[in-house]
Amino acid sequence: MTTMAKKSLQLGRAVEWPHTPEEAQLDRVPNPQKGTDYLVRFTVPEFTSLCPVTGQPDFAHLMIDYAPGPWLLESKSLKLYIASFRNHGAFHEDCTVMIGKRIASEIKPKWLRIGGYWYPRGGIPIDVFWQTGRVPKGLWVPEQGVAPYRGRG
């Protein structure tokens, strides 16, 4: 697990882009509001990965919501982690769930969900959803607001 004590933060310094999701470092920082329940949302409107069969690019709009525990996810490290999927071959379901699980394992949130809204390939859009468990009582969680794919219909 990445902590500020074990590895230095990538924030504020030049770092190389990671070549694979496994190589990418996710950083966390202490949550100064750890006694308060609140929601953090990351929107990734231009996620890309590769189809593991054809090597063709796949595109998605990702929404990551989490209720922080003792740690916050540092956004520059998230950007680098997301970019590491650009040449990674995996199915939509695997990419979406892998991202959610990796973030959850690194920052230990009270709750986390990810929505992967994948653009059509072969005429079929695929939406993938994963979460760690039940939403904490009293937490305001807005809808992700990504409309179902309609094409010209």
Curated annotation (Swiss-Prot):
One of its GO terms (biological process) is tRNA modification. It catalyses: 7-aminomethyl-7-carbaguanine + 2 NADP(+) = 7-cyano-7-deazaguanine + 2 NADPH + 3 H(+). It comes from the Bacteria. Its EC number is 1.7.1.13. Belongs to the GTP cyclohydrolase I family. QueF type 1 subfamily. It comes from Bradyrhizobium diazoefficiens (strain JCM 10833 / BCRC 13528 / IAM 13628 / NBRC 14792 / USDA 110). This is NADPH-dependent 7-cyano-7-deazaguanine reductase. The active site is at C51, D58. Pathway: tRNA modification; tRNA-queuosine biosynthesis. GO terms for molecular function: preQ1 synthase activity. Keywords: Cytoplasm, NADP, Oxidoreductase, Queuosine biosynthesis. It is found in: Cytoplasm.
